[in-house]
């Protein structure tokens, strides 16, 4: 397994419950595909460097995981089709 850092930005107009629901969705996806969650950081609402999908702010979440490369590809696919996610990035950390 490799170590990854997953960063994603949720729309700022979502309610706290919906944020938690989306985070839980990705948490379940990681665990169901054999990944291990090391740490979840909720950075909260922050200003974006530039406008993304007509939003100036976003709710940042950082998740550190141990996972196989297939899971990283699956996460990328699901992030792309999830409307609540403005941007995402999956980075493999050096061992």
UniProtKB/Swiss-Prot annotation:
Signal peptide: none annotated. InterPro entries: Ribosomal_bS6 (IPR000529), Ribosomal_bS6_sf (IPR035980), Ribosomal_S6_plastid/chlpt (IPR020814), Transl_elong_EF1B/ribsomal_bS6 (IPR014717). It holds the Pfam family Ribosomal_S6. Keywords: Ribonucleoprotein, Ribosomal protein, RNA-binding, rRNA-binding. SUPFAM superfamilies: Ribosomal protein S6 (SSF54995). GO terms for cellular component: cytoplasm; ribonucleoprotein complex; ribosome. GO terms for biological process: translation. One of its GO terms (molecular function) is small ribosomal subunit rRNA binding. The keyword Isomerase does not apply. Transmembrane segments: none annotated. Binds together with bS18 to 16S ribosomal RNA. NCBIfam families: S6. PANTHER family: MITOCHONDRIAL 28S RIBOSOMAL PROTEIN S6, SMALL RIBOSOMAL SUBUNIT PROTEIN BS6M. Belongs to the bacterial ribosomal protein bS6 family. This is Small ribosomal subunit protein bS6. It comes from Pelotomaculum thermopropionicum (strain DSM 13744 / JCM 10971 / SI).
């Amino acid at each position: 397994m490799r170590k990854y850092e997953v960063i994603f930005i949720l729309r700022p107009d979502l309610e706290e419950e919906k944020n938690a629901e989306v985070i839980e969705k990705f948490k379940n996806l990681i665990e169901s595909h054999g990944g291990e969650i090391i740490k979840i950081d909720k950075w909260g609402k922050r200003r974006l460097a530039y406008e993304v999908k007509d939003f100036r702010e976003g709710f940042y979440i950082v998740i550190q995981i141990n996972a196989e490369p297939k899971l990283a590809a699956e996460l990328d696919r699901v992030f792309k089709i999830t409307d609540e996610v403005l941007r995402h990035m999956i980075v493999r950390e050096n061992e």
